[in-house]
Swiss-Prot record:
Keywords attached to this entry: Ribonucleoprotein, Ribosomal protein, RNA-binding, rRNA-binding
A GO cellular component annotation in the UniProt record: cytosolic small ribosomal subunit
Protein name: Small ribosomal subunit protein bS6
Gene3D superfamilies registered for this protein in UniProt: 3.30.70.60
GO terms, molecular function: small ribosomal subunit rRNA binding; structural constituent of ribosome
InterPro entries, A to Z: Ribosomal_bS6, Ribosomal_bS6_CS, Ribosomal_bS6_sf, Ribosomal_S6_plastid/chlpt, Transl_elong_EF1B/ribsomal_bS6
SUPFAM superfamilies, A to Z: Ribosomal protein S6
One annotated GO biological process: translation
PANTHER family tied to this protein: MITOCHONDRIAL 28S RIBOSOMAL PROTEIN S6, SMALL RIBOSOMAL SUBUNIT PROTEIN BS6M
Domain of life of the source: Bacteria
Family in the record: Belongs to the bacterial ribosomal protein bS6 family.
Membrane spanning residue stretches: none
Length: 122
């Protein structure tokens, strides 16, 4: 299996649907015996340039380990989801698990850590 970093941005009017979208993508990865090493919700941020007259969007970062076929399925899902404005998939040499420098590490909502803490609390 290969390691990938995926960033996708969602239309700001669809921000409330981001958790359901992330859950759907997580199941696609885990059903194919893939692993999610890092999953961060960066929230709504200013775009560098307007996309379809939209100036802000909701960002999500995923570092995963899976097969190229699953990555193709994910990219197809991104392409046919009208809420996803842009997506980028990069193949990496190794798994990245530390917090991203984008938000200074601790500000980022790490969805994997949050899920692990909820499971430990129950």
């Amino acid at each position: 299996m290969r390691h990938y970093e995926i960033v996708f941005i969602v239309h700001p009017d669809q921000s409330e649907q981001v958790p359901a979208m992330v859950e759907r993508y997580k199941t696609m990865i885990t059903e194919a015996n893939g692993k999610i090493h890092r999953l961060e919700d960066w929230g709504r941020r200013q775009l560098a340039y307007p996309i379809n007259k939209i100036h802000k969007a909701h960002y999500v970062l995923m570092n995963i380990e899976t097969t190229p076929e699953v990555v193709g399925e994910l990219e197809t899902a991104f392409r046919f989801n009208d809420a996803v404005l842009r997506h980028l998939t990069i193949k990496t040499k190794h798994a990245v698990t530390e917090a991203s420098p984008m938000l200074g590490g601790e500000k980022a909502k790490n969805l994997l850590v949050g899920a692990a803490e909820e499971a430990a609390a129950q």
